[in-house]
Amino acid sequence: SRRSGGDAVVLHGYDEAATKRLRGEFAALPAHEANLRLMGADRVLEHVGLRTRLFAAPGWTVSAGTVTSLPRNGFRLLADLHGMTDLVSRSTVRSRVLGIGEGFLTEPWWCRTLVLSAERTARRGGIVRVAVAARQLRKSGPRQAMLDVVDLALMHGCAPAVYRWGSDRPASSAA
């Protein structure tokens, strides 16, 4: 399986269609409703053999209710717009998501800014996290920006990694 090969399974929403037009699915949910959605998603993933303890909300934004509900449902890592939080130790590794599409801009000036920001972060030894909507990769500008981000991060010593939770190294193993 892909998981045994090192890939991470990350829960990225459950019923986004109900809220997509307004905001990210978990951006404004109270704890009770977030709890219901997380329980439902967890059961579905368990049924198909993809149960995970890692969570990244659509739009990278989570409500306080969602943050409260995640550990109650066994989740151990939250990846949001500004960092990765170990929900067991409550420690956060700060690292901003740099993205194109799906809530992020796609204009040429944004692509240039994204590349410069990623290079600055990598040069300073930070964690470079990228997100791109697949449909944006059909366009040459966003595609080249993402390739440049990866090349520059590697050039400055960043190592590719997946989101992973480990009690010995909270959250910082993801990049």
Residue ranges with predicted function:
Residues 17-20, 62-66, 86-87, 137-140, ...:
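Short catalytic/ligand-binding loop motif for oxyanion handling, primarily in non-cytosolic enzymes
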Residues 9-12, 54, 77, 94-96, ...:
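Glycan-processing catalytic domains of CAZymes
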Residues 1-68, 127-134:
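Metal-dependent polysaccharide deacetylase catalytic core of the NodB/CE4 family, i.e.
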Residues 10, 71-86:
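Acidic, His- and aromatic-enriched active-site or binding-groove loops in soluble protein domains
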Residues 17-46, 85-124, 142:
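Alpha-helical scaffold elements lining the catalytic groove of polysaccharide deacetylases
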